[in-house]
Design a protein with these regions (language model features):
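Trp- and S/T/G-rich repeat-edge/linker motifs of beta-rich repeat architectures
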Residues: 1-40, 62-79, 101-123, 155-176, ...
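Short, solvent-exposed loop/turn segments that connect beta-strands within catalytic domains
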Residues: 15-21, 47-51, 87-89, 130-135, ...
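Structural signature of eukaryotic scaffold interfaces centered on beta-propeller domains
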Residues: 41-49, 83-86, 125-133, 181-185, ...
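Entry beta-strands of beta-propeller and related beta-repeat scaffolds
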Residues: 49-55, 89-92, 133-139, 187-192, ...
Length: 268
């Protein structure tokens, strides 16, 4: 997504179970897409009636069922900072005054809370996992008042109440990254990012979401990727991880990677 148009490409295998080697992108024109849209706030909510897109613009929320036709959702008000949409049918809304969850586009709100400080308010990435057979969501992102040396994941089991996974042990935490991206992939947690803005040069892994280490082998970024200086977004469509660089007016690139153990013999 850009401010001017959306672009799409196939990411599913064809009838021969082959994935596209080249990304053939097509343009989708918008109708009523909001000015000053905060592109990093875009989320996709899965629900009983399919999927729906939401984005924040000037502290208001706008939605679309197809990515092309957009409308303003007045019930959310005009104090929205960010959105999280990882639980089916539940949209978590972060405002100037706190956090709440809604199942009906803001008509009814379940007031939530976060334990501690420095809850993410922008560039939020989320991932789903299970703990004791219960669905959970983990997020990372930027906080306007964060003075911590760590990238701290936050976890929720309902979208309303959030707990930080702080690490007090020496040298086994994920350092503070400029634009961290979290994912649960191949039965491990990963955080991608860099200490520098608009760079992607490190992957950290964890088995519990608390203790982290930098990957040294098997799961690494290509050297050419680490030399790119541009904003990026990352999407997991297992078994693939897609990294999209762009948005700075000069650099546009798409990379795709995977763990070999997750690839079937037919796909490889």
């Amino acid at each position: 997504f850009t401010q001017d148009a959306a672009y799409k490409t196939a990411i599913q295998p064809d009838e021969n179970n082959k994935y596209p080697s080249d990304c053939n992108w097509t343009t989708e024109a918008y109708t009523n897409f909001p000015n000053n849209a905060q592109l990093s706030s875009l989320v996709t909510l899965s629900g009983d009636n399919g999927q729906k897109l939401y984005i924040v613009a000037d502290n208001t929320v706008h939605s679309s069922s197809d990515g092309k036709l957009w409308k303003k959702e007045a019930e959310f008000g005009d104090k929205v900072q960010a959105l999280i949409a990882s639980f089916p049918n539940i949209l978590t809304v972060i405002t100037d005054n706190g956090v709440y969850a809604t199942k009906d586009d803001g008509v009814t709100k379940e007031t939530g809370e976060f334990s501690g400080t420095n809850f993410p308010t922008e560039n939020i990435y989320s991932t789903n996992f299970e703990s004791n057979y219960q669905p959970q969501v983990m997020i990372v992102g930027k906080s306007g008042n964060d003075q911590s040396e760590q990238t701290v994941p936050w976890v929720s089991s309902n979208g309303s109440y959030w707990v930080p996974l702080n690490n007090t042990a020496y040298n086994v935490y994920c350092p503070k990254l400029a634009n961290p991206v979290v994912m649960y992939y191949g039965e491990n947690y990963y955080i991608f990012g860099s200490k520098e803005e608009n760079k992607l040069d490190a992957i950290y892994t964890s088995v519990d979401g608390i203790s982290w280490r930098k990957t040294q082998r098997k799961f690494l970024l290509d050297k050419d990727m680490t030399e790119i200086t541009a904003p990026y977004s990352i999407v997991v469509n297992a078994p693939y991880i897609w990294v999209i660089f762009g948005g700075d007016g000069s650099t546009n690139a798409v990379w795709r990677g995977h763990l070999n153990k997750l690839m079937s013999a037919e796909v490889q």
